A protein has these predicted regions:
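Interaction-mediating elements
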Residues: 1-215
């Protein structure tokens, strides 16, 4: 995560973190079982009767879908897509919370956010710098979750120590989403205001270069 950056996290449907999936299922009220090293989703409150078959299962972090029902009627496929989108939204939020809280960030609601058909959640993860004499020690990174589980982040100035922690969390998010963001495609750099151009790590490519002193 760089200063003045917007990133997009796209969910790879073939990859899921089991711990996050279990928490998402609990949040959604879905029925699941754990069998050895597999998490198996048996019921997602869908209208269609699966006749005792599973909806999806995850072994390691690899997802397998029930191919029989994936090939079924168009209406059911549409319903399943809506079901999986709900899962992706909760999965996305749980992933963000898990990885950013692990490096010391805290959750902050966006009380001004009004959900739309496309944008369903928005909130901030907040971190505090420990750099000596840092004038802007508080960092808020904005997260917007779209209706299909895509995550869009937005940041402005980030102190260097928080920058490194956010980088760590973002890399873990890449792993959980099963996609690696690409510079200039999913990662977009914003123009750095003149005030911050002297900060060597607020560079065009987001690379850290300076040395910090933490009190």
């Amino acid at each position: 995560m760089s200063c003045f950056e917007s990133s997009k996290f796209l969910k790879n449907p073939q990859t899921m973190n089991q711990a996050v999936l279990i928490k998402a299922c609990q949040e959604l009220g879905w029925k699941y079982e754990i069998r050895q090293d597999e998490v198996i989703i048996l019921n997602a409150n869908q209208k269609e009767d699966l006749k005792g078959e599973y909806l999806l299962k995850v072994k390691g972090d690899v997802v397998s879908y029930n191919n029989y029902y994936m090939k079924n009627a168009k209406e059911f496929v549409t319903e399943l897509q809506e079901t999986f989108f709900k899962l992706n939204v909760v999965y996305a939020k749980e992933t963000i919370l898990k990885e950013f809280e692990a490096v010391g960030f805290t959750f902050k609601r966006d009380f001004d956010f009004v959900p739309t058909k496309e944008e369903v959640e928005r909130f901030y993860m907040v971190g505090y710098s420990k750099i000596e004499n840092e004038e802007e020690n508080k960092t808020e990174i904005q997260f917007t979750i779209l209706n299909d589980g895509t995550v869009i982040t937005d940041s402005n100035y980030i102190p260097e120590d928080i920058h490194k922690l956010a980088d760590e969390a973002m890399l873990k998010m890449d792993e959980a989403f099963g996609n690696k963001r690409r510079e200039g495609i999913e990662i977009k750099r914003k123009e750095v205001p003149i005030k911050y151009q002297g900060k060597t790590y607020c560079s065009a490519n987001g690379q850290l270069k300076s040395t910090i002193k933490i009190s």
